Amino acid sequence: MSHGGGGHAAELFPEDQVLAIGAVLSLIGIYVAQLFPSVSMLLGGLLAVGACVAGANTTRRVAAYGLGTGVPSIGMVSLGMGTISALAGVLIPAAFGIPVLVTPILTAVIAVAVGFIVGKLTQNPVGMKVPIIVSSMTKLSLMGALAILGFCSAFAGGFSADIIINGAISNGVIALAFIAAGMAILHPFNACIGPDESHKRTMTLAVACGLIAWLVFSIAKLDIVSTAVAAIFWLYTFGTFVKISLADACEVKYVPELPKKE
């Protein structure tokens, strides 16, 4: 059922299961990027898509309470919290001599804490009356952090401070991660919202958005194999989304080319 007129259909996939799968896949991808840098974009980039899909699913659930134009905003908040958490997770081990392999777990812990604090602040003093806002902010912060760290690690070839700083921060790639992952998290429900929204269609678009984010990073890295695989996966998934959309539509009207003269 939808809440507050937000336009959200019954769930086909339990949110906590989607969240757990997305978190596990993205964490595996982050470690693959560190331990096997030669396939960091091919496998690490692919598995980072899991965090985007899980984040999009949580956006769908919280936005159904009638956020309206807040759907894009909450996606940007997710990546804002995620960027802070990812940078802290990368830099703290280097500053305090902690083993670098704890970086992804530390990032996740920091993200959960940041998301919880921001969620509480949205209740008081901001005053949002969404019942699940604290848990949703916590989950969105976690998925944003894992998406940022996932794509940056895939591009740079690891997550140690020196690798990330030189390979993803100094060159501005982290900004690309912010926008690409942010769009993958906020866009699916924003595009599918309405009385005829379906979980299957929204999640199919979420996968397509995550895959196109991976494709963008593959192209930026000039990784031919990853680019080809990502393009094939994206074309198939987006094609599936279009077919589902046409099947769900009440009526399909094909608009001819606009006349060039009056």
Curated annotation (Swiss-Prot):
Keywords for this protein: Cell membrane, Membrane, Methanogenesis, Methyltransferase, One-carbon metabolism, Transferase, Translocase, Transmembrane, Transmembrane helix
Subunit text: The complex is composed of 8 subunits; MtrA, MtrB, MtrC, MtrD, MtrE, MtrF, MtrG and MtrH.
Keyword Cell membrane: yes
GO cellular component, one term: plasma membrane
Cell compartments where the protein resides: Cell membrane
Family: Belongs to the MtrC family.
Native organism: Methanococcus maripaludis (strain C7 / ATCC BAA-1331)
Protein name, per record: Tetrahydromethanopterin S-methyltransferase subunit C
InterPro entries noted in UniProt: THM_MeTrfase_su_C (IPR005865)
First-listed, main subcellular location of the protein, grouped into a coarse class: membrane
Pathway assigned to this chain's UniProt record: One-carbon metabolism; methanogenesis from CO(2); methyl-coenzyme M from 5,10-methylene-5,6,7,8-tetrahydromethanopterin: step 2/2
TM annotation in the entry: 18-38, 39-59, 74-94, 98-118, 145-165, 173-193, 205-225, 227-247
Catalytic reactions of this protein: 5-methyl-5,6,7,8-tetrahydromethanopterin + coenzyme M + 2 Na(+)(in) = 5,6,7,8-tetrahydromethanopterin + methyl-coenzyme M + 2 Na(+)(out)
